[in-house]
């Protein structure tokens, strides 16, 4: 006898946004033999760094006259050295076609500046201090005038209090909590250095984005919340943002 589903079944999944750091390998030449040798040398220096490391293969810096890339061979070499390819970044038609053929996602070229990673430095154990340093607590930053679109206000080492409206396009950042005593229509990012106990308080939730310690919700998600437009408190539990009425 088949089981009849209820008209309003419980959701079996959620789509969530998260800010993750992923290693990008930028290929300068399509010489797979040289790549194999150089990767082997890097692995010998820092084996723990190359252990199921997620990877984006960036082919967008290859010269237009550079020969075609053997993408399956490139992915295989990376896998042999502990790098797991998630997607490629490309702008040449032949590279995009090769990625589609092996069912790899294609990302657009990035205009952002990317930091060069030294695997040896990344793997080196950091010496722990004998006694944890006392946290440096800075005075709360208080803003009394309206925060307009395009403005960014950062409370380093402490809380941020805004006793005026925050317009769309404005951005509030704090290492601690954020309090907005007025309409919150911009972006609010609390605990930006990883403080999972940080909170966001606002008199009117109409934000473009709210974030605590890297976990965030955008306006499309927030508008579906029954507390949209109400006075709320936002906290983080695990990787879930909880919104409750003030």
From Swiss-Prot:
Keywords: Cell cycle, Cell division, Septation
Annotated organism of origin: Pseudomonas syringae pv. tomato (strain ATCC BAA-871 / DC3000)
Function statement: Cell division inhibitor that blocks the formation of polar Z ring septums. Rapidly oscillates between the poles of the cell to destabilize FtsZ filaments that have formed before they mature into polar Z rings. Prevents FtsZ polymerization.
Domain of life (superkingdom): Bacteria
One of the protein's GO biological processes: regulation of cell division
Name of the protein in its database record: Probable septum site-determining protein MinC
InterPro entries membership: CAP/MinC_C, MinC, MinC_C_sf, MinC_N, Septum_form_inhib_MinC_C
NCBIfam families per UniProt: minC (TIGR01222)
């Amino acid at each position: 006898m088949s089981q009849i589903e209820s008209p309003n079944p419980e959701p079996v999944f959620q789509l969530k946004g998260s800010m993750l750091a992923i290693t990008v390998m930028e290929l300068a030449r399509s010489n797979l033999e040289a790549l194999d040798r150089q990767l082997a040398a890097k692995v010998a220096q820092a084996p723990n760094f190359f252990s199921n490391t997620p990877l984006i293969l960036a082919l967008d810096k290859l010269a237009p006259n550079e020969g075609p890339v053997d993408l399956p061979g490139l992915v295989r070499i990376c896998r042999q050295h502990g790098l797991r390819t998630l997607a490629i970044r490309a702008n040449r038609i032949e590279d995009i076609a090769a990625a589609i053929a092996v069912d790899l996602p294609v990302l657009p070229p990035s205009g952002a500046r990317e930091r060069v990673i030294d695997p040896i430095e990344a793997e080196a154990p950091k010496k722990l201090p004998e006694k944890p340093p006392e946290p440096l607590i800075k005075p709360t930053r208080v803003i009394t005038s309206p925060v307009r679109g395009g403005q960014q206000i950062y409370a380093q080492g402490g809380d941020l209090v805004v006793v005026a409206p925050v317009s769309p396009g404005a951005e509030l950042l704090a290492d601690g909590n954020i309090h907005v005593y007025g309409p919150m229509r911009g972006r609010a990012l609390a605990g930006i250095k990883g403080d999972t106990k940080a909170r966001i308080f606002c008199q009117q939730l109409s934000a473009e984005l709210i974030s605590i310690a890297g976990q965030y919700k955008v306006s499309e998600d927030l508008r579906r919340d029954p507390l949209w437009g109400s006075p709320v408190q936002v906290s983080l539990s695990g990787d879930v943002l909880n919104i409750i009425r003030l």
